[in-house]
């Protein structure tokens, strides 16, 4: 056993992740490991940490599950994605992982990189740089109707500028999020 610690990111809705439950049990018994679950707080082990908000997955820049991250001296020293027995054994220092399992299997796409999710997570947990004031819209009020009532349309349909839409638009321009373009 090494002085390394590990973080494992999984989701129940991934055949590779569900196949590897015996491996997670082996690792938990022999290594300091934190298991983050993206979709089911009861999976894969009782010690798993609920990451349904995907905040930790976002900050860890997870693209595929399972992802096993190794830390040494408090900093990430490596990561592996998917399942390849020999690679996991070398990476963790634990031999004979998952003896009855197939030797290799690719992982699945992580929930935090699903279409539309990257923008939502960037606005929620990242540094979007946006400082514009938000206009509160009563939940009983239709934001499109409100835009028409305030004269924010030339008669064409209006798409309310949600933070996600604004962030996505800013990715296609050289404008800074705090730049004033009109008054």
Feature map (PLM): residue ranges:
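Short active-site neighborhood of thiol/selenol oxidoreductases, capturing the structured segment around
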Residues: 2-24
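Catalytic cores of nucleotide-enabled group-transfer and carboxylate-activating enzymes in metabolic
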Residues: 3-4, 27-29, 37, 68, ...
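Residue-level signal for short, function-critical loop segments
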Residues: 11-13, 39, 74
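Long, low-complexity intrinsically disordered regions
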Residues: 100-126
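Metallocofactor- and cofactor-centric catalytic cores in central/energy metabolism, strongly enriched
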Residues: 118-183
